[in-house]
Amino acid sequence: MVAAALRAASDAPGYPLTAGTPQLRASIGAWLSRRLGVRGLDPDAVLPTIGSKELVGLLPTLLGLGPGDRVVHPEVAYPTYDIGARIAGAEPVPADGLTALGPGPVGLIWVNSPANPTGRVLPVEHLRKVVEWARVRGTVVASDECYIELGWDEQPVSILHPDVCGDSHTGLLAVHSLSKRSNLAGYRAGFVAGDPDLVSRLLTIRRHAGLMVPAPVQAAMTAAYGDDSHVIEQRERYAARRTVLLAALRAYGLRVEHSTAGLYLWATGDEDCWLTVAGLAASGVLVGPGEFYGRAGRRHVRLALTATDERVAAAAARLTAVPTLD
């Protein structure tokens, strides 16, 4: 269905609309309402992006941040939040609590729920406090919600949900991607939505920078956000892999923390992550060292649910065939 939409729109020699087609913006708006409970979103407050990673990496720059500005991100986090701040010349600040930020100004706060790599879900109350804190100070809050349709033991909530932000999207940006929910990483298809004034600023700069999503990809996005059945099917596959890997990791002797949503299992053997990486590698299982995601992750490893069913089953068999850590 998505590939068919891409093919049907492939004869597109002209420049695409940086703002996105009206059909795409309508499809995204309907999805945000239908799946995430977002209300009152301005149709012009939706902007397609070339995947979500380029937006994450460029957002501080696009917002005009630079030397002397602070960009806050989770202590254990996707590295591009840090890199994006550095690209702009701003200061990246890893912090999980608002009190640690002190009285100085903050230009941008990143939240990520469900989180990569931890799979942690932030409760509504926490998100609401972040929004209230930021609005008092004129700080932009950007919420990376790429895994939001992959809730397992907890259901994530969007920063744009009225329980979080009330009746206003002022100061808020939600970032989304088709890479995870629709398994379309190769299409480089995502969007940002929220505060219409902020989105308008981003649109103006992106037009001049040539940051536009190709027309065939916009057509594919329109189809993907209009269909829920393929997402449900993909969720079922991830859920089955998660069940298999959870049991295998526990049998091996690792403790799985958070991991209540998203595509990853965040595990620890209560030792330096590189020792855990080496032990698992000796069994033929490759994992990501938690240190890659910040100093606070140096005793954890990340396992992804993105391998094929056959590879996940093989990894589980290897984990349960070796002596445990206990």
Each PLM stretch: what is its role?
Residues R7-A26, S33-R35:
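A glycine-/small-polar-enriched, mobile loop at the entrance of the PLP active site in fold-type I
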Residues M1-L6, R34-D326:
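PLP-dependent class I/II
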